Amino acid sequence: MREPQQDTVERWAWDYVHASTLADKLSPPPPPEGWERGGAARRIESPGRPGELHIVGKAKKTRGLDGEEGRARALHTFLHHELQAAELMAWALLAFPETPPEFRAGLLRIARDEIRHTGIYAEQIVRLGFGVGAFAVRDWFWERVPTAKTPASFVAVMGLGLESANLEHAASFAARFRQVGDEDGARAQELVGREEIAHVRFGVTWFEAFAAPLDFEIWRRALPEPLTPLLMRGHPLQRDARRKAGQSDRFIDELEAWTPDTPGC
């Protein structure tokens, strides 16, 4: 696979995905202004990983949040989700060079948001007395998202799927952190959740551009197998946030009602 030209956004994306130090993952240099012309599709198979990150096939789940270690573990999981999201936005920028410039510019913008979110979570982890790498992580997003063969499938699983579910997860964990008196941790998650709305809206906009007006069944079929709506929602659904992101009440109702036994599935 030929590497992108130097001093291009594509090269920045390439270098970010392949970066193998925490500094380059958490604080990469700003991207150049120039883009490649007529670049080939590049589908990176796996990201670079800093030595501090211990990647496992199945990460230990967070249980209680009463103690600082439990909260740090939860935040560490969220940090790794944001890191993978940033990498996969850069991945898509390289994988789908034929898409409109506005779409690829949006991917770059969201990647930089996600990088900033990793920094927010890193600060919170340090506040609790731990560091990035203190807990094992799983590259689950990387196991699934690159199976998306088309731009429509990519935004179906990222913007309309995983990032939409984060609207619920951020709200739920913010409430749980606040319940045990960790206001700083709660506010960090609320900030990420608010900014996620624009990312979901981006997914809605471009799913409709690449596929069809947002419809639950069309979206469900666009998810790369074996993914289903089951993993693309939290509880309770954040209806107001999803509406602000452009999802209709009908879409939200169907998402909430969906089960693996739903007829037609």
Please place each PLM-identified region on the residue numbering.
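Non-heme di-metal
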Residues: 1-265
